[in-house]
């Protein structure tokens, strides 16, 4: 995989990304606590027929992590567009966002000056307005600093159990350990501020204005963002298709249902 020179955007921040292949531009954007690393398999797979790009949001992965930023999702969408412009100019893209990345993708698609770049949208395990009873019980303690999101025990138990189905955890212990290690490398301030931004995001009333074709992907056992949220998006987004991956598939569909995920995305791309 080609690790390209880091892009510098207007504020002087350096943004990391990975890229491989030629053809239509597929841009993958990761979720909360993630990085481009979570799409390495997809970059390899889709680069056979497409130009596949995965970007580290500001504050994530190998990108700069300035403490001066609020890390609200609207800003991350604008930074994302600036990075895309530096990489591919004015070319069109298909934007594929997972979890928080899917929320950013919806903001992108409902912001006219940004949306004009889109050929299509893939919304993966995401929501226009976040709610989760498990998170609701602890969010005040997290936001006040009583609970450290990046405490190793919290990551290994609560976060991993929200991200992955138990069956997958048992089948892939080495991968789960690597996922924990990568998560613990996350900047604590960024983790907290993006957590707050996810909680504050509400674009439910805007997604009816998405005009490009949209593929909505969810799974039957996602306990981080519930399948019902995807069903709601399907109702609201005019030109959209919903696929629920099963059986016993958790939040990270690109891992737990890799082959079905690849097929669903490929089948969608050839129709737009």
Regions found by a protein language model. Name each.
Residues 1-26, 48-51, 88-89, 116, ...:
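Alpha/beta-hydrolase fold catalytic core
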Residues 132-134, 152-208:
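Conserved alpha/beta-hydrolase catalytic His-Asp/Glu region
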Residues 210, 216-218, 222:
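Short beta-strand/loop motif that positions the catalytic acidic residue
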């Amino acid at each position: 995989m080609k690790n390209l020179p880091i892009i510098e955007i207007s504020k002087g921040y350096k943004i990391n990304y990975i890229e491989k292949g030629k053809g239509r531009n597929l841009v993958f954007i990761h979720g909360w606590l993630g990085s481009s690393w979570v799409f390495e398999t997809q970059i390899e797979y889709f680069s056979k027929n497409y130009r596949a790009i995965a970007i580290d949001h500001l504050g994530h992965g190998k990108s700069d992590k300035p403490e001066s930023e609020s890390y609200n999702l609207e800003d991350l969408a604008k930074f994302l567009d600036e990075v895309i412009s530096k990489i591919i100019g004015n070319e069109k893209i298909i934007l594929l966002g997972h979890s928080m990345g899917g929320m950013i993708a919806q903001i992108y698609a409902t912001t006219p000056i940004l949306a004009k770049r889109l050929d299509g949208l893939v919304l993966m395990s995401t929501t226009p307005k976040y709610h989760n009873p498990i998170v609701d019980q602890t969010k005040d303690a997290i936001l006040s600093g009583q609970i450290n999101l990046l405490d190793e025990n919290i990551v290994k138990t609560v976060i991993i159990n929200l991200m992955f189905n138990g069956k997958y955890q048992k089948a892939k212990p080495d991968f789960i350990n690597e996922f924990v290690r990568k998560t613990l490398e996350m900047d604590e301030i960024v983790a907290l501020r993006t957590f707050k931004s996810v909680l504050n995001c509400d674009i439910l009333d805007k997604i009816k204005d998405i005009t490009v074709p949209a593929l909505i992907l969810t799974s039957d056992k996602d306990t981080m963002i519930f399948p019902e949220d995807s069903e709601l998006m399907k109702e609201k987004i005019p030109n959209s298709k919903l696929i629920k991956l099963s059986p016993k598939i958790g939040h990270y569909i690109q891992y737990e249902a890799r082959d079905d995920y690849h097929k669903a995305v490929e089948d969608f791309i050839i129709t737009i």
